[in-house]
From Swiss-Prot:
This is Glutamate 5-kinase. It comes from Methylococcus capsulatus (strain ATCC 33009 / NCIMB 11132 / Bath). Pathway: Amino-acid biosynthesis; L-proline biosynthesis; L-glutamate 5-semialdehyde from L-glutamate: step 1/2. The lineage of its organism: Bacteria, Pseudomonadati, Pseudomonadota, Gammaproteobacteria, Methylococcales. SUPFAM superfamilies: Carbamate kinase-like, PUA domain-like. Catalyzes the transfer of a phosphate group to glutamate to form L-glutamate 5-phosphate. Substrate binds at residues 56, 143, 155.
Length: 374
């Protein structure tokens, strides 16, 4: 994506809404405001756009319910507030989306869920299945069980990692600012808004400041970091004011709202770089001529029936190569099954996986979305 003209072509979008927008000045959830974003998301769904909602607000809502005026610093108190507030947050979204005939699903994640390869695949598979079913996944950090070592730190980062996982076309971060400004607008009200920039533009570092609300964990600098993280998988980011009327449909229509941050690589190139440079090969599937031809010519998923040998020892989520019988690498990808499981189901049709293993994770050994040609 290189310009706003391409935004109307987005088919999968991550929308992140921060605490400062979701709460009514620290007095609990702002139901009317949340209702407006829910209505906008419903409009996007009517256009066939898949939407994942990453929502802050559980700690802020918990603080309100517990009568706390300032955000606590102790982790156990934050976790207690999150536990109390998450109830209200989920109930609110479920009720409001139901008015539009939409089902919601709650997903609470920790950093481990997206850094561990096996759990990453499980999380990704669940989210994609929900999207296929027309459900709106509502994702938040699992504050109740996280420790300092496994916290995302802010939901901007969580939104970016979810965008990476599901290969979203666009990450929209709604905030209490109109976007990125050339100078701090709190100090210089005449500072111009930056409508668009390349994600690696060195000037961006001088443009970010801190949010003033005190309810959330992330200032503008975390939003820029999140945009850069999303860009690693080729996802563009728009940072815009959540208080702008009809902001979500207007952004997807290509209107110049907020700041568009453009990735420097396409999603396919980004994924190839990631698999080539960040992951270590753990094994190999040797495939027959038919599977080799399908992989080379069509880039389709690798099915168990096309595998004639399994080399190495690996677990679900590891990177494995696909080679022909002569040892020529055709592709590489993330396996849905361990080496032990793969040896049991190779040469077999996918319909027999459950019969052989007693369960079925996926019908493919490697799904085409997790496969890149060599």
């Amino acid at each position: 994506m290189q310009s706003r003209n391409e935004l109307p072509g987005s088919r999968r979008v991550i929308v992140k809404i921060g605490s400062a927008l979701l709460t009514a000045g620290g007095k609990g959830l702002d139901q009317p405001a949340i209702g407006q974003w829910v209505q906008q998301i419903a409009e996007l769904r009517q256009q066939g756009i898949q939407v994942v909602l990453v929502s802050s607000g559980s700690v802020a809502e918990g603080m309100s319910r517990l009568g706390w005026k300032t955000r606590p610093h102790r982790l156990n108190e934050l976790q207690a507030a999150a536990s109390v507030g998450q109830m209200g947050l989920v109930q609110t979204y479920e009720s409001l989306f139901k008015r539009h005939g939409l089902q919601t699903a709650q997903i609470l994640l920790t950093h481990d869920d997206l850094s561990n390869r096996e759990r990453y695949l499980n999380s990704r598979s669940t989210i994609l299945t929900l999207l296929e079913l027309g459900v709106i996944p509502v994702i938040n950090e699992n504050d109740t069980v996280t420790t300092e070592e496994i916290r995302f730190g802010d939901n901007d980062t969580l939104g970016a990692l979810v965008a990476n996982a599901v290969e979203a076309d666009l990450l929209i971060i709604l905030t209490d600012q109109a976007g990125l400004f050339e100078r701090n607008p709190s100090l210089d009200p005449s500072a111009p808004l930056v409508p668009q920039a390349g994600i690696n533009d060195p000037r961006l570092n001088d443009m970010v400041g801190d949010s003033l609300s005190g309810l959330g964990r992330g200032g503008m600098i975390t939003k820029l970091r999140a945009a850069r993280l999303a860009a690693r998988s080729g996802t563009a980011t728009v940072i815009a004011s959540g208080r702008e009327s009809g902001v979500l449909p207007r952004i997807l229509d290509g209107e110049e709202l907020g700041t568009l941050l453009i990735p420097d690589v396409s999603p396919l190139i980004a994924r190839k770089r990631w698999m080539a440079g960040q992951l270590k090969l753990k094994g190999c599937f040797v495939v027959d001529e038919g599977a080799a031809r399908v992989l080379r010519d069509a880039g389709k998923s690798l099915l168990p029936i096309g595998v004639i040998a399994v080399e190495g020892e690996f677990r679900r989520g590891d990177l494995v190569a696909c080679t022909d019988s002569a040892g020529q690498e055709i592709a590489r990808g993330l396996t849905n099954y361990s080496a032990e499981e793969a040896r049991l189901i190779m040469r077999q049709p996918s319909t027999r996986i459950e019969e052989i293993l007693g369960y079925v994770d996926e019908p493919e050994l490697i799904h085409r979305d997790n496969l890149v040609l060599s």
